[in-house]
Amino acid sequence: MQPTISSMVGYTIRATDGDLGKVDQFYFDDEAWTIRYVVVKTGNWLSGRKVLISPVAFGTPESASGTLSVKLTRAKVAGSPDIDTQRPIYRQQEVELHAHYQWPWRGGYGGTFGAIPLPLSVDEASSEHESSGPERRDDPHLHATREVIGYHIHATDGKIGHVEDLIVDDENWAIRFI
């Protein structure tokens, strides 16, 4: 199935032991053209906190019921690192997130599962980041889908149109069409 991003906004995210919340938006990698995270608005059970979940944990979206199951527990999600989804997501935050969930690395600087091994520890990643000198802390290839829907597309000879939606392959979470 190839659902649109807009059709999945509002889907219920279902953990193994109950509902987590609703899909707020997605983050994608503009080099690999894959979904890297879903932003879940948790509602009352976690004080309205928004959390990031990788497609590594996704099941298949069920369009009839508007649900997306994930292979996580509510307790695991509640203990996840607090990331402000209104600000750029920093590489260090991604390292901490992947370490918490024990997910393989996905996207950025490689774009596929396992392209870059997860550091042995968060401390190791911190010291490596500090010693590498000044560099950009956020990932310039990570974008919110809400940010790009509506973008105008231009060719060398004029305007083509605008981004209405993104169509994804729900097996590998690659963006297939815009």
Feature names for model-found ranges:
Residues M1-I178:
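Peripheral interaction segments used for macromolecular assembly
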